Regions:
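Glycine-enriched loop-and-adjacent helix/strand subsegments that border the catalytic/binding cleft
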Residues: 89-226
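N-terminal non-catalytic cap/leader segment that marks the start of a structured domain
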Residues: 1-114, 212-214, 222
Length: 226
């Protein structure tokens, strides 16, 4: 299943794609709760969906039983304006030189230990928003990445258990001001200024749950410029 954030009448909302249609899961919860005289959780953002995923599946099942063939018609979001599937409080942890081919492009080998850096969540824009270059930019490069969405809190997780913490996947574009990055690297400085400016992280358009991608190591990611 796919999880998406969208804007409706100026309000940020969240939904899931079911049978090819985006449905407003918060509205589903509200209406079904009213019909059954039960209290179901509210869903305001993607974190609510991730943390209460078992309710999402139950609500869809109950909705199909109650509304039958009218379910999708009643709850479908028409012409949605998709926004980045993230909340501003999210943590974005990135890996440098994580693709062997990309490492070769830089003239180096893939590192034995992960090279970790971070990006601020307020750098994120939706997948089809315009990327505005900062005034100081001389060379801006796109870097398309597979983004792994962590679904629950963990610490000191063993490698064998790591996938238990994954909720799903989306696509990220790690926009980088390359000349600034190289200049900072020569000084031994971190990759911070070159990767943390407004609009430096297009993300989305949605999150695909991990059950739909049994082998995330066998995916093709493609990016085109202009």
């Amino acid at each position: 299943m796919r999880v998406a954030s969208f804007e409706s009448k100026g309000i940020e909302k969240v939904g899931v794609f079911y049978k090819g249609k985006l449905i407003d899961i918060d509205l589903v919860s509200e209406i079904i709760g009213h019909k059954l005289d039960k209290e179901f959780p509210a869903f305001f953002n993607v974190v609510d969906i991730i943390e209460q995923w078992e309710y999402v599946e139950k609500l869809i099942e109950k909705g199909e039983k109650l509304f039958k063939s009218e379910f999708l018609k009643f709850f479908e979001v028409k012409n949605p304006l998709l926004t980045a599937p993230i909340i501003r409080e999210s943590k974005i942890v990135c890996l440098g030189k994580n693709y062997a081919e990309h490492a070769k492009e830089t003239g180096s080998k893939p590192p034995e230990e992960p090279i970790i850096f971070g990006k601020f969540a307020d750098c994120v824009i939706s997948h089809d928003e315009e990327i505005i270059y900062p005034d100081f930019a001389t060379r801006v490069d796109p870097e398309v990445e597979l983004a792994v969405v962590i679904g629950k809190q963990g610490k000191d997780v063993d490698a064998e258990e790591a996938m238990d913490y994954v909720f799903g996947y989306t696509i990220a574009n790690d926009i980088t001001e390359r000349e600034l990055e190289y200049a900072d690297m020569k000084k031994g400085w971190p990759w911070f200024r070159s990767k943390n400016f407004d609009a430096a992280m297009p993300l989305g358009p949605w999150i695909v749950t991990k059950d739909e991608i049994p082998n995330p190591h066998n995916l093709e990611i493609e990016l085109s410029v202009n």
